[in-house]
């Protein structure tokens, strides 16, 4: 059966790592890589792997969408330009998976709400942030047991894994992640903190999640829920590991994670980028399965 053809916008760290994952997919075929710098290493690497490339940005891709049957596009550029990209692509019937913090479309965290997005047939879904993909499943694991008044996450990532796009979007990162802690994670109030650690050798991504429950926490039920969710995330991010917890202190529930990447293009310590690209690939594969089946209800997370 024919694969669903895709374009990637942004040949940086995230776009290139995502390309490696898509090349392994049984249902997705990466066809185009889009950039703005003619001398970009990412564009050169994509050409070496057999993709068509353009350094003319989104406008260099648009004339080829129909001829190359591009059905899904991944935007791994910047929150500042995503709105333009999304408008031009969705107007031409292309589904957009947004890996920037722009959050034009609804948030998607695969083990929490991907199935609902497949059924609603949205043209744009937002993958929140790397910190959001790592921590929101844990907030939800608590909130599905009992109400969470406050959820706070701290994502600690290696400085080497944080490219210029992420650094420009730090404010958007914190706002978008906090919003998704509430909208997807189920906390009444959310807060997100990112720590960029310059240590050498680089440290693997570490995440700390604190939830304040409204009532005394159900220790057994929350513990079981957390372990179940860890298993769900590990289906597509094998390096997603519970290092400690859940730890209970009054109404506070604390969970400590480590996220190691697969090492496709990026080093294994860059689990923050790997969980983002793995989540985007999983989302696209489920959307593609629905496209092939011709019915949104046939694909599940």
UniProtKB/Swiss-Prot annotation:
InterPro entries: Acetaldehyde_dehydrogenase, Acetylaldehyde_DH_C, NAD(P)-bd_dom_sf, Semialdehyde_DH_NAD-bd. The active site is at residue 130. Pfam families: AcetDehyd-dimer (PF09290). Its EC number is 1.2.1.10. NAD(+) binds at residues 161-169, 272. It is an enzyme of class 1 (oxidoreductase). It catalyses: acetaldehyde + NAD(+) + CoA = acetyl-CoA + NADH + H(+). GO terms for molecular function: acetaldehyde dehydrogenase (acetylating) activity; NAD binding. Keywords: Aromatic hydrocarbons catabolism, NAD, Oxidoreductase. GO terms for biological process: catabolic process. Belongs to the acetaldehyde dehydrogenase family. This is Acetaldehyde dehydrogenase. It comes from Cupriavidus taiwanensis (strain DSM 17343 / BCRC 17206 / CCUG 44338 / CIP 107171 / LMG 19424 / R1).
